[in-house]
Amino acid sequence: MSKERPKRNIIQKEYDDSDGIPWSEERVVRKVLYLSLKEFKNAQKRQHGDGISGSLKAVNGLLTNGQSKGLESEQLENEKDDASQVSSTSNDISSSDFEEGPSRKRPRLQAQRKFAQSQPNSPSTTPIKIVEPLLPPPATQISDLSKRKPKTEDFLTFLCLRGSPALPSNMVYFGSSQDDEDEEEEEEETEDTKTATNNASSSCQSTPRKGKTHKQVPNGQVFNGSSKSLKEKEPAQKHKSKEATPGKEKNSEHKAESRKDQAAANHHPTTNTGSSTKGLTANNHHTLHRSAQDLRKQVSKVNGITRMSSPSANAASAKKMRDVRPSPSKTVKYTATVTKGTVTYTKAKKELVKETKLNHHKPSSPVNHTISGKLESSNAKTRKQVLSLGASKSNNTAVNGVKVNGKLNQKTCTKEVGRQLREGLRNSKRRLEETNHIDKIQSPTKRMKGAVNLAEAASKKAVVEKPLLNGHLKKEVPEKNLERNRPKRATAGKSTPGKQAHGKTENASCENRSTSQAESLHKPQDSMGKHEKGSSKSGWGMLGEIPILRPSTKEFHDPLIYIESVRAQVEKYGMCRVIPPPDWRPECKLNDEMRFVTQIQHIHKLGRRWGPNVQRLACIKKHLKSQGITMDELPLIGGCELDLACFVQLINEMGGMQQVTDLKKWNKLADMLRIPKTAQDRLAKLQEAYCQYLLSYDSLSPEEHKKLEKEVLLEKEILEKRKGPLEGHSENAYKFHSLPRFEPKNGLINGVVHKNGFRNKLKEVDVPLKTGRRRLFAQEKETTKDDEEEEEEGVLSDLHKCIYKGRSVSLTTFYRTARNIMNMCFTKEPTVAEVEQEYWRLVEQKDSHVAVHCGKVDTNTHGSGFPVGKSEPFSRHGWNLTVLPNNTGSILRHLGAVPGVTIPWLNIGMVFSTSCWSRDQNHLPYIDYLHTGADCIWYCIPAAEENKLDDVVHTLLQANGTPGLEMLESNVMISPEILCKEGIRVHRTVQQSGQFVVCFPGSFVSKVCCGYSVSETVHFATTQWTSMGFKTAKEMKRRRIAKPFSMEKLLYQIATAEAKKENGPTLSTISSLLGELRDTELRQRRQLYEAGLHSSARYGSHDSSSTAMDGKKKPRKWLQLETSERRCQICQHLCYLSMVVQENENVVFCLECALRHVEKQKSCRGLKMMYRYDEEQIISLVNQICGKVSGKNGSIENCISKPTPKRGPRKRATVDVPSSRLSSSSSSKSASS
């Protein structure tokens, strides 16, 4: 038995041509092919017998209006004779007879007729071939026709491989016009005067031809091609056939006449497009003749040959198209058919039956809307634009640039254009006419995604081919520019988030474009801004471009040397963009599983906090609170926050929850809310969110809604009267203003954790725990009061917040969320201009809830995007941002590793992720490199505009008593258009993958991401910055803002290190700053001693006097802490030179705040001063620096003589300050005294 088993398992058809096809299917295919061939031969014989007379008349000449009545009667007889033969096909799917058994089986058999009859003249990717009626001409032409028949297996191969790279090159244009002479012969053959064929096929071709224009009869009735009214229409159809049958017109006069007629038809007020009925009627005899000529002359150029098709060519085409239409159960929902050079799109059978039945029962309804496959927009639709598309259509007539919300978009899709060029679709007047009229009509099913994509493909084809339409020349969009503007998210799904666009990074960085090319990338957008703003175009017109630098390979070595060489030219702009040489190709290596805490930004609240959407949400929250329901955070679906305010509005417009459930419209509602279809259980989560948060609110009466709205508005007014504008409100923790904007701390934003309202209130993470503080501090009392007030404010307590703490996610999860939010905001890949336009619309109108995520990640924890291995290329390059902090030209190298300053950090964003208007708190310059992902839009205001900007923002935000710049730094986005109109210089640039952006000290900068992107940033500083940095440090201390590093430490570290090297320029810059610092430090020490603070100790040493007085106490651990970790309790100043500590409470004061505390408390009990350098060491260091700077001038005496008078009284007043050099006994005596 073992020997027989292999024989049983042998597959008999292993080497057969049809391997992989089940035997049952193969048998059916063979049977159907046989029947199809047989039926084809019979049909050919019948056509030869019935239509020979009409065929000869059509070939030999033109039929005019003056033909005899005898010909008219002869044509009528032909119609009647042939009616029985084509009755099955004339009753198209628009007729109710389609549901009968024979009609249902018929398409299946006739669909296979393609295999025996298909011709190599139709586009390669369309499943419906052009099948023009093959009327038998003389016998010599029959042999020519037979040579053009392809093999059945070739056609099957084409069907399986169409649109894919595997399609053989000889089949790429399978079905398109290749042999021009044969093509013309075929057209002559198909110019038939059989009016019966025209009549019978009128309904067939009208159903799928969605874009065909038509005229209305005076009574408003339009022929729908149904078999029921066929006999009633025969006189009119007969009359139409007689005039529509003239053959080719080959002279230029006829062409010019037809062009004029078509131009007139385009502007005819009664020209409309029907959704399913395309029959032509005429108001008068002359108009009918002209329109018939226009419809007949479809001119398109294929391989340089102008061809013209006759109307009768559509008869069999429509017939075959109806036969081969795929089953509704298949995945193919739309099929494309080329008839007379016009692309028409048809839906599956069931949908067509529904539409045609609807139109059949309502023939008197005005046909003023288009099909679902002809939606006019060629741009990415946003949620708002999709919902309000109908209102914005009426004023938009451009094909290549469609206005949406009053702004002009000029996006074209290169991918779709390229595909259509590859298919070889023929252009025609009718198609261009339909495209021109597209903006005047509405689609009944315009939100269907497939239809939108097909319509976009058709509209973009019309843009590229540049024909004359109505005397206007269509704009041709260069493919090169389209490639350059193409977004970078398309390939994201094919690779990991960390590496998904690295190939694009290399391509972008490798292109050594000229200056004019780079500028052309943005100047069109700027000019677009002028048009898209309408009345305010003067604001966008003044928006300047940031300089673009292209260093050579030799110049691109040391970033600080290169930046210093161009500083004079570019610093006045506040920022510049650097495009590296082509050989700069560092590979971005990120761990896809690295985790970080995100930041959630509410884009609609980045401008003014209060808007329509925020008001509705406040009403919902207030009602829920009255019901005892707490909504700490909005529900999430697919990682995206659900817009509850829009949700409740849409569900009411659809008739309420009950009707939505009964009619099963939850799916449609989810699509309208733009919830990602890939989100798990999106309908269940949507229903759960409604029941949990909106059901109670939705059941309120209109009077209760108005009452609730009045209460919310009253509460808002009271809040603003007490605290000022919402934008100026700050949380309690901002009194601790922990760290600068760009500093990540363990993956947290700004080193802080949010923790109030939806999420947690701000809490400083790098300040040591203050668990033992007493209420004797006024700040603690103020904090407690503010906490109580916030609880009383209720739902409006967090209105001033627009940024919240998110979750800890992996890079892969973040990427998926970014993809979902992109799909919520746009229906397809947007351009930079479209993202920018939609972003400012959301910020200014505030009518939609849009929440996006971003993250700032410390590279010291999760790794840099740059190569860091010693053997890796570019790991030691100067522009590698992990190498830059150690550059000898940067004075920040003396600080060591400081998170957010000398340690680079990653900026991970998605579409609309924003870095609001701000400047570094220390006014430090920095460099940003875009590793991978979508482009980023940067706006910059130079430092010279600071005072003017302060006044403008103060006026715009109505900041009563609050400096404008302080409000601007509270996450407020003001449009560059508004700032430009106020006279402030604003510059803009678009950073692409693989490019650097350099920001100069003091510049105000904001950034908007156009999609998922990863960039890396690090600070640097030269000696020219020290004066500005010292001034900024004093201002931050006054405003009680925490600094990431101590300016005192930096100056002393520079002085110690550079004094050994005798670096004259650097020492001369810091000498005056060191002198000022010395005077301030010694004066404050003397004042504290005079106030009664006599206990002191040096850092790192234990005061023996304290242990002698209290033997039970052990040395405090905080005595051994570095001063960089100790901040003043009051002003958040980093205490480097000295500080005052309260031993019992473990609280730190700077000398200035300690003096105020002693004066207020009238006691120094429990306080001790800690210092790093004693008085003599400070003076000695300053004198050494001044001596090296002065050199042989002898001016060092001035540096030494200043502190001398202060030194004498200090020593006489206290003998225990230099306690490290005194004995323990003397220290204890001085302490006891």
Swiss-Prot record:
Residues 84-96, 309-318, 1219-1233 have a biased composition (Low complexity). GO terms for molecular function: chromatin binding; DNA binding. A motif (GSGFP motif) lies at residues 863-867. Keywords: Chromatin regulator, Developmental protein, Differentiation, Nucleus, Repressor, Transcription, Transcription regulation. CDD domains: ARID_JARD2. A motif (Nuclear localization signal) lies at residues 102-108. The keyword tRNA processing does not apply. Residues 115-127, 195-208, 216-228, 268-285, 365-379, 506-519 have a biased composition (Polar residues). It comes from the Eukaryota. Residues 610-702 form the ARID domain. Residues 229-262, 423-440, 473-485, 520-535 have a biased composition (Basic and acidic residues). Residues 178-191 have a biased composition (Acidic residues). Signal peptide: none annotated. It is found in: Nucleus. Residues 1-10 have a biased composition (Basic residues). One of its GO terms (cellular component) is chromatin. Residues 873-1037 form the JmjC domain. Residues 546-587 form the JmjN domain. Associates with the PRC2 complex. Belongs to the JARID2 family. This is Protein Jumonji. The gene is JARID2.
